[in-house]
Amino acid sequence: PIPTFYKRLQAGQGCFCSDTVRDFLDMSDFLELMDRVMDSGAPSGIYNISTGEGHTIKEIFDIVVSHLGLRLDEPVPIVPPGDDDVPAVVLDPSETERRLDWQAKIGFEETIRRMLAWYDEYGVTDVYSHLKAGLGQASRGE
C-alpha cells in the first residue's frame, strides 16, 4: 500500500485503508541476513524472516500523510479485508533469531520513512494492488 498511498495522495486522489495488520521488514535487514546465511553455511530449514511486530495499514497511511505534509479533508475510510485478503499476517521470528543469531534492526517507522525518501528522489511509476480504487480526499497542508 505504500507506493499506492504515496502516488494517490501526491495526486490529490482519495485512498482507503483495509482493516488489516502486517509485519513489515526492511530490505536492508533481509539482505544482511541473506549475506550472513550464504557466507556462513547456516543450518538448513524453514525460517520466518520478520520483525514479529504487527502494524495496521492505517499506521502506514498516517506516516505517508505526515511525510507529504497533507491535511485530510475527512478521515480515511477503513474497510474490512476483502474476500481475497487475510486480516493479519505477523510471523514469529524467534526460531530464526535463535538458530541464526539474527534480529531485525531497523524499526517500522524508519523502514517506511526510507521508502518514502526513495519515492521522493525517484518517484513512483506503476502501482499494483488487488484492491479497488478508494475513497476520501486529501489536500496540501500549510
Locate each region found by the language model:
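C-terminal substrate-binding subdomain of Rossmann-fold SDR/epimerase-dehydratase oxidoreductases
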Residues: L9-E142
